[in-house]
Amino acid sequence: MKLLVKAPAKINLSLDVLGKRQDGYHEVKMIMTTIDLADRLELTELTEDRIEIVSHNRYVPDDQRNLAYQAAKLLKEKYQVKQGVSIAIEKTIPVAAGLAGGSSDAAATLRGLNKIWNLGLTMDELAELGAEIGSDVSFCVYGGTAIATGRGEKIEHIKTPPSCWVILAKPHIGVSTADVYGNLKLNRVTHPDVDQMAEAINRGDYQGICNAVGNVLEDVTFAMHPEVARIKTRMKRFGADAVLMSGSGPTVFGLVHHDSRMHRIYNGLKGFCEQVYAVRLLGERETLE
């Protein structure tokens, strides 16, 4: 059996870190939403008992470092699946960009193999398994828009934000999430109001959403990589309604309501940044269909 699965990227509209936990993870409170930028995975069932990762992107590992590989391995071991799988990954989401590309690939693998191997797992069960792989995988199983707490694995779904353009700009660097969290000093940062963002989304208040964006990790990444701060400044200057770094970076996104302004910002960033995208907010939840 062969199955094609989409793995959409996410952005953080609001991201706060509340403290460090005894297990070494950080306690977070954040709002994530999916966007119309996606990897495509082709899952092909194999008769041999092996997991194969195929990708033409040299930054995508083809072994157990790959989160899609880990997802397949987890299902095989937990449910004693004897068949193997070939996972062909067509990367569109930039790697190590703060957009959950690897986590979304893992989530898509969980959803797809649940169907191919007739495991009959619910979305909640898949999300619980996803938490064993990575903090963002649970959200990526569902997609849509949600408040994530704990280390990111506790998901509360909220309404979809009003539709708008999202301009993404990624410089030619990768950022280590562990390094960013390691340099975070919680008593020296501005904490965003995540509840205010949730209320604005539930009201369908686009201006309120723009006013409430915030990411406690921004200043840390900006200090480590000043070019990320320069992208934010440039995007603001070209007229984005709101600008924020996603996750631990280095990708910066801008929310834009009007087509003409979107084109101006997009063109103003091309050449200044290695990768620039203009996509739409998705906000739709995944299904098991």
Curated annotation (Swiss-Prot):
ATP binds at residues 94-104. The keyword Nucleotide-binding applies. It catalyses: 4-CDP-2-C-methyl-D-erythritol + ATP = 4-CDP-2-C-methyl-D-erythritol 2-phosphate + ADP + H(+). The active site is at residues 10, 136. The keyword Kinase applies. Keywords: ATP-binding, Isoprene biosynthesis, Kinase, Nucleotide-binding, Transferase. GO terms for molecular function: 4-(cytidine 5'-diphospho)-2-C-methyl-D-erythritol kinase activity; ATP binding. Its EC number is 2.7.1.148. Coiled coil: none annotated. Catalyzes the phosphorylation of the position 2 hydroxy group of 4-diphosphocytidyl-2C-methyl-D-erythritol. NCBIfam families: ispE, PRK14608.1. This is 4-diphosphocytidyl-2-C-methyl-D-erythritol kinase. It comes from Bacillus cytotoxicus (strain DSM 22905 / CIP 110041 / 391-98 / NVH 391-98). The lineage of its organism: Bacteria, Bacillati, Bacillota, Bacilli, Bacillales. The gene is ispE.
